[in-house]
Amino acid sequence: MASKHSAEYYSNLKDMSPIRAIAETLMNNHMVRTVNISEAYELAKKQAGVGMTDLPIYPEFAKLHNLPADAKVLNDCHGNIIGRTAKARRFYHHLNSSQKNKLEGDFREAVWQMQQYPLIKAEAILGMDKDLMLKATFITTESDAANLYNWLLNFTPFDQLKEQYNASPKLPIQDIILIAFNEWTCDDTFYNNVGAPQLALVDEKHNVIVAWTSGIRIGMAACHGGIKEIDFGTCEDAKYHKLGVRSIAFYGLSGTGKSSHTNNADNAGTLPRGFSKVVLHDDAFQIDLENKICRAWEPTLFDKTDSRPIDHPDWKYALALMNHATLEIDGKRIPVGQDLRNSNGRALLDRGLLGEYVNHCAFPKALVWLMKDSVLPPVIKCTDKHLAIAMGAALMTQRNRAENVKEEELNKLVFEPFANPFRVYELYRDVDAFLAVADNGADFYCFNSRGYWKESDDILEAIPLKTSLTLQTALLTDQLTWEPWSALPGAMIPTRESIEAILPGFYDKYNPETRGNKDNYITMLKDRFQQRKDFLMSSDLKEKPETQTKLVESLNIK
């Protein structure tokens, strides 16, 4: 299904916001030159700060997009981080009339400034499945060509899927317009300014925004997570065949294990021999609640490379790099990961590194919230749906260097509802969506990806990744039976008999009843859950008081 251009979408053009009208006018200016991905590559090579490595672009991708046969991976290196910060966001529809008028004027002024520069634009399709395709246009300056080039790499250039897109039924939603202007100057204190003025202007109702909001507007659940589908029908041992096809999804910020759980080839050798696996995506997808299916937005991965040394096999899938060191090795310019130059080095990688991948997959059997909360056992199952969604809506985690935050913020526990820092709409809409996921039969779990209280919040019992991967397999294969976690009604932990059969020593090691300094542990447990309750009480869930009450009451610690 395809989005609509403005003349199609607005039966009354007066319903269009001034923000979209300004964006549309710029987009349709004859002085804005349309470029394809090959032209964007050539422009990006000449951009200040961009270096060409001797690492070839993944050949299959280069061939598909008609890039030069000898195309190389470009490394776009920046100075201080001034973008990617929530403080820069201004939500047009959240402002009062006076503030809207001011912002409209400032936006017109910024676009006028922008038109003093040579401008380029490109079109892409967001969404990999014929039933979820949005057209998007990105407009920027020629001096920002690498940004546009990387955007085309991350999604699908429009011409690649033009025929399929044009043949699709129309969605009740507008095309997306994005505008970037790095040379913007403004000293108005209304806007964030750290070395340079920053404005991320969001008009979510008129699709001057990213794709997450589009999905929620048409009744889907937006997921900042990874999801894979396992087919047990191909297992060598026939006892697994009855499990059929099962999908499992993981939600967490960078560094919580989301990609490790999604992309691991065989869950550290714990999946039964002969299984078949496909991955939808390790970072972003939508759950179509009407058709009970999951759909991908992007054909590529935007990954951290801090754990990928020079000889890592993933480098062959590289398409573009950001903020990587480059060394001369055997006469060639070789990019180096492992955050050698600065933290949060990133790579755009072809989905081929996932092995078998798909554009849509089965509705999830299980959803897992990945928590950085030391008072939680390694795994809990939420049998109360309101507890399940409350834990997602008040997902507790730690900030990381993938985000533009101060150093002292990195170790603080924070709430990031459903692990989605890109949400620009009301929280209650995500809550409603995930309650619907629960009503459609999905099971919900919490994994502790930090470590479990041993003696204090600083002295923790480690939870190795292999242990968590083994637990994942146990969930998928119904190996666990459950008993109530006495501290939290509606939550369950594995029984001794079932968990010891697959992870000997687990029950005693992680038994909530045997935590050191037990009184302090209980005090901290109650405090963390009170923080969750306070967070939900202070959120826009107050617009849905009945739902808010049910979620908050589910978080009562005994």
Predicted regions and their residues:
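Conserved NTP phosphate-binding and transfer environment spanning the P-loop NTPase/kinase superfamily
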Residues: 2-69, 329-558
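Long, basic/Gly/Ser/Thr-rich N-terminal segments
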Residues: 2-203
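A structural signal for short, well-ordered beta-strand segments and their strand-loop junctions
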Residues: 118-125, 249, 280-281, 367-369, ...
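Extreme N-terminal, non-catalytic leader segments
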Residues: 168-245
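Secondary-structure transition/capping motifs at alpha-helix termini
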Residues: 217, 235, 268-279, 437-442
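Glycine-rich phosphate-binding P-loop
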Residues: 236-271
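Conserved, well-ordered active-site substructure
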Residues: 247-249, 291-308, 458-478
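Conserved nucleotide-sensing/catalytic segment adjacent to the nucleotide-binding pocket
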Residues: 273-347
